[in-house]
Amino acid sequence: MIMEDFFSRSEALLGAEGMNRLRDTRVILFGVGGVGSWCAEALIRTGLTHLTIVDGDVVQSSNVNRQLPATRETIGRPKVEVLRERLLTINPDAAIVAINAMYKGEALSPFNFLIDAIDSVEAKTDLIINATRVRGMKVFSSMGAALRFDPTAVTTGELMSIKGDALAKAVRARMKKIGLHPYRKVRCVYSTEQAHPCETRGSLMQVTAVFGCTLASMVINALKTDN
């Protein structure tokens, strides 16, 4: 079966030109855990062929309930390596670069899209600020998916106007503290559901996966809008 057949259902909606735009698009994704891993898979399954994934974590047993790279067999392995192997089984012709490192404020190379799915407030803040400095690169970010049950409460909004999300609030507070703000508006995925506190930071796949798939849809819809 030729490779085009695998993406025929995507092309039915996006059209031949839309598929070509998706194949030519370059995306960098920071964080491949409970949100980012599902975003990566959704993009590759839709037809994206140029993806760079960045994460310095290894798979842990506590990841198995929600993270795509996590199985009993992959515990202890770098998440980006496991995910790259999986994505290449979906499309062996895809150019997938795996960077086993945490973001520490470095300058960013230009991509068409940057997706932020990291948890650290400091790293997330620095990434958003630096990413919005890169001309022509669209930036999408994930806010807090943990401590929630309801996938139907997942929505999107602009970072500075999101309410009821502790992570968005913490990011804005750090921006104010360091005196730096995004150079342009940043569209985010978040949940309107009130967080449910628990002793450990609980999270469920049905919510984190919807966050990830929403991020992927933001990329695809942006390409459609730009057409």
Regions found by a protein language model. Give the residues of each.
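N-terminal charged helix/coil linker that caps or initiates catalytic domains
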Residues: 1-27
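Conserved N-terminal Rossmann-fold NAD(P)-binding element of oxidoreductases
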Residues: 29-31, 54
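Hydrophobic/small residue at the entry helix of a nucleotide-binding pocket
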Residues: 35
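Hydrophobic residues within alpha-helices
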Residues: 39-40, 83, 215
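Conserved S-adenosyl-L-methionine
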Residues: 45-50, 133-136
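Glycine-rich phosphate-binding loop and adjoining beta1-alpha1-beta2 segment
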Residues: 48, 53-90
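Conserved SAM/SAH-binding loop
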Residues: 99-105
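Glycine-rich phosphate/adenylate-binding loop
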Residues: 109-113, 118-126, 130, 139, ...
